[in-house]
Amino acid sequence: MQVWPGSSYPLGATYDGMGTNFSLFSEVAQKVELCLFDDSGRETKIDLPEVDGFVWHGYLPNVGPGQRYGYRVHGPYDPGTGLRCNSRKLLLDPYAKAIDGKVDWHPSLFAYDFDSQDRPNDDDSAPFLPKAVVVNPYFNWGTDRAPGRPYNETVIYEAHVKGLTFLNKDIPLEMRGTYAGLSHPSMIEHFQKLGVTAVELMPVHQFVHDHGLRERGLRNYWGYNTIGFFAPDAAYASSGTAGQQVQEFKGMVRDLHEAGIEVILDVVYNHTAEGNHLGPTLSMRGIDNQAYYRLVEGQAEYYMDYTGTGNTLNVRHPHTLQLIMDSLRYWVTEMHVDGFRFDLASTLAREFYDVDRLSAFFDLVQQDPTVSQVKLIAEPWDVGPGGYQVGNFPPQWTEWNGKYRDTVRDFWRGEPATLGEFAGRITGSPDLYEHSSRRPVASINFVTAHDGFTLRDLVSYNEKHNEANGEGNRDGESHNRSWNCGVEGETEDLEILELRSQQRRNFIATLFLSQGVPMLLHGDEAGRTQQGNNNCYCQDNDITWMDWANLDEDLIRFTSQVSQLRHDHPVFRRRRFFNGRPVRRGAGEPLSDITWFTPDGREMTEEDWESGFGKSVAMFLNGDGIPDRNQRGERITDDSFVMIFNAHDGSIDFTLPASEYGSKWEVVLDTATPQLAEPAPAAAQTVLTVEARSLAVLQRVA
């Protein structure tokens, strides 16, 4: 077979219409073989003829899309010094843009001899490893444009491609559980009904089903076990796995964009599926273990583990950083995605041992003209020391606000001494973000996410019920800040069911009407349950799949209406923090942009906030006090609102503010009823009864 020198850049397999350039980085390689596989699995080995700056490369004319390939890296095998080359192991290209097949767990996948890890395993792993695929980069995007939705107009919907669509009978059978199914008209209609402007997809990079799960008859459902940072997982494709998955993913993005919906990817750049020192050799470990992974200093056979998965990517190494940045740029420029949610993002900031917001990774993102312009969302923690970094990411980043989740849960389950922090969380968490010149939209607000209870389970279970995971119910978070409303799990008690429904409305209304960016877990709007399992990482079955035949239509309708209320009124989605403080203003001064009231109509004092037993408060939002301006520089104004929160177990009479705040009000939302309230008039200083554990919203009409 004819081989030309080719080029060291770009890395990976790049088809140009006449042939394909192959390039692979390895500082430790002594020789690199490109291995081509035909449809029968027959292997043809070709030495890459050139090496330039530790990048091995060659060009093969007439090799095109659909060609399956892998690499064999010849080099030193000395685990004690962190060297793990073994040419008997076929290796996936870290830059593979498509991957065909699944890991077939076999002893040959492990580079070491099971009797002595210092000896290499000489069995050939090629028959048991998936193959990289050369892809056709050309796609008809038509008039596709990124929606470019501002954060303060964004509503995020966290979704699992398969779990959301697999049981939806409005989607053709062959498309359920796939990229094509996610952008089916029935799904787009559902998103639009909820006011969703961005879907945040749980991991769609090619991932591996863990060996331990396979032995227990389970599968990796969530997908946080990546092996290909450029390849959309082929299991979510209805059209094929020899490159068709790339085209299908692009089609999904194009269709969602046409509907005005952005696509955000949950990405896992902190570790790979190769695990710890006892794990398999699938890709980077056999290519250049020292460059790609953080090794224990002085004990290089072992891996630093800040992720709880066995290894940590070495973001201190320039080629590992390049891999991550190249992957991010590829997904933006070639796949047209609109942003990323970075799993365990604190790990990416660990240049040495501590989390450093000035790390090279953040510097590279900041100066990159492509990546810096999309939505960047951090999961601001990892499992290492000092890993909890909520509020500490650089200014252009937003963060999953775990403190919002915890505080809102505590408030609505009636925990004492939460009122002051609750007020801060629903106003954008200024204590976390204002000091670094960030805006309220730095806070991605959520009550539930994939990791933990669904909203229905949050109000139905006090304890986790993870027995189906096969770990003796030891896995998963034990401190859930949940309340079952009186009975653990499912019940036919109508009073308890009504209270649970009301609590769900409380959470949804609080989420959508808080300052910041709301994120809704898929199915929470429809009553999805996981039967009390709060760690469904391995449940690819009806425990996690959304049951479209039994939707809570009332809750869907309520969610849609509250989302519309947020959309229609910029006072609920300000771009700047409030200036008002919970103290009385002076005579003759204009109304503050926000004012807090006790149930008897007094402005809250410091003593009121410090009371450990307060569970109710009224909040005045001044529609004339919005400091934001529109694109033409015109001042934004809105109606004023009063929001009344009552987390007590009994009803409370609230006195509405004096006439200077508004002479006439209408109740537009009351979570004590399943439907959005019919406008009910109320004059200034009217006494309004707010039911136990409910939220009421009043709009000023005069």
Write out the residue ranges for each language-model feature.
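Conserved, mostly hydrophobic/aromatic
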Residues: 24, 71, 159, 201, ...
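Carbohydrate-interacting/catalytic domains
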Residues: 1-157, 162, 179, 491, ...
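Short catalytic/ligand-binding loop motif for oxyanion handling, primarily in non-cytosolic enzymes
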Residues: 78-82, 165-167, 207-211, 271-274, ...
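Hydrophobic faces of well-ordered beta-strands that scaffold small-molecule active sites
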Residues: 155-157, 199, 263-265, 340, ...
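Conserved alpha/beta catalytic core and glycan-binding cleft of carbohydrate-active enzymes
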Residues: 357-522, 527, 535-539, 570-577, ...
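Substrate-binding/active-site clefts of carbohydrate-active enzymes
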Residues: 160-336, 344-367, 387, 432
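Short, flexible loop/turn elements at secondary-structure junctions
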Residues: 28, 50-52, 62-64, 75, ...
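Core domains of carbohydrate- and sulfate-ester-processing enzymes
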Residues: 73-140, 211-225, 279-306, 419, ...
